């Protein structure tokens, strides 16, 4: 109970103290003190015009990234310059992480490479991501090798991939590294187009069937967000993750939120950070989310900040 009273007091104090946006530019101490608290384990926002860090919170904490991995999957596919209209068979045979994972997509049915990319990016379809890797020149292992080589070339020094979907806890990165991935994504306009598609129908062949798919990022449905590229991710180990290239305060930014508590917490944190940047207002964080963050931080400290399955 004493801890609960302290949390309420801290929250009341935070809300009671007026935020002075002019003080942000005056001193580094004022900037640090005025930064908002978030519910997520780590985050970073970078101004894409200047590469200046606007906000960071534990940006170098190495954590599982879940389906954020699919952004790298898409980049490696496009780097290979393979025909986008080629029909690919749904194949997960070399992705053991897929065992027992439900999907509406039928094994061995076929759809174009471009539609595979759409389903992987827009709706985070795991069988689509795995199939893209299975149909890579040189095979599945060559694809994973290319993912890691791409990460290294981008200076993502704390990033590692072992499979293309993000289901493995060993697909890890940091908020800082993921901003580098977002910066690189500017060279892939198709990824931006597909990842921000709100919804679509996918028609498969052999056998023929059609399925509806929707975007996993709820913010793409809001007209007050200008989102140019996005990807969400979730596993129990990674928590809820969100990356976006978007516009905040009339500036293009790369936004990364990792290891958030609750189904909508990563979206709420993105909105909190946007509000702070645009207005200087600090929005409160629910006590349950802060408790989750504290517990995760303790677990990471006990494990020496290594990525482990919870």
Swiss-Prot record:
**Any idea which GO molecular function terms this record carries?**
endopeptidase activity; serine-type D-Ala-D-Ala carboxypeptidase activity
Superkingdom of source: Bacteria
Q: How is the protein altered post-translationally, as described in the entry?
A: Pbp8 is a proteolytic product of Pbp7.
Protein keywords: Cell shape, Cell wall biogenesis/degradation, Hydrolase, Peptidoglycan synthesis, Periplasm, Signal
In terms of InterPro entries, this protein maps to: Beta-lactam/transpept-like (IPR012338), Peptidase_S11 (IPR018044), Peptidase_S11_N (IPR001967)
The organism named in the record is Escherichia coli (strain K12)
Instruction: Output the Gene3D superfamilies linked to this UniProt entry.
Output: DD-peptidase/beta-lactamase superfamily (3.40.710.10)
What protein does this entry describe? D-alanyl-D-alanine endopeptidase
Q: What is the lineage of its organism?
A: Bacteria, Pseudomonadati, Pseudomonadota, Gammaproteobacteria, Enterobacterales
Q: What does this protein do?
A: Cell wall formation. May play a specialized role in remodeling the cell wall. Specifically hydrolyzes the DD-diaminopimelate-alanine bonds in high-molecular-mass murein sacculi.
What GO terms fall under cellular component here?
periplasmic space
Q: Which residues form the signal peptide?
A: 1-25
| Catalytic residues of the enzyme | 67, 70, 124
